[in-house]
Amino acid sequence: MKKYLVIGNPIDHSLSPRLHNYWFKENNIKAVYEKKQIRESDIGGIISEMRNGKIDGINVTVPFKKSVIPFLDKMQIPEKTQSVNTIYREKNKVTGSNKIVGRNTDIIGFKNSLGHIKYSIKGKKIFILGAGGVTPSIIYALEEMEPSVIMLCNRTKEKAQKAGLIYTDTQKKINVNKKRNAHNGHRATRRFQSLAKPEK
């Protein structure tokens, strides 16, 4: 029986095992899909288990989408996203050796979801709330869809800049503004990172 995992921290909330195991059962596939909470120091061991055939595939969620990259033999992702969410073994037909390959399905998944509802964002203003692990992939997908402006809002300026500055080749400007709001009796600072495409 094949074994698949989703790794992250935290991971208790993940519904991936329920979805995948249902799909396996409905399609008569002899496989099991589990979730595993790990630390960054565990990544090497997990990849070794995969290389040795104990694990057949891995999905990766926060906060490890970037930190798994040094353990891979090959990546099939846009380099500037620096985000891997799927890992699998690729067998060399000549030597018989296994390569551990990382892919990013966030990009095509986001594109397909918009395509499914037949919604075009060309020329529209886009607002992204949060700069988590999937954000660089979403920005990459959006850039190919030609919106007029992409605005990224995050609690910390540094993380917003890290997610946005990957795309300096397509940016017209970066504006960082501060807005103060009352929150639980304290003054909370929120920083807004604004990314804009060059006008054509």
Residue ranges and their predicted role:
Residues S67, K157-K162, F192-L195:
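Short, charged/polar "capping" segments at the starts of alpha-helices
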Residues D56, S148, R180-H183:
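Conserved acidic residues
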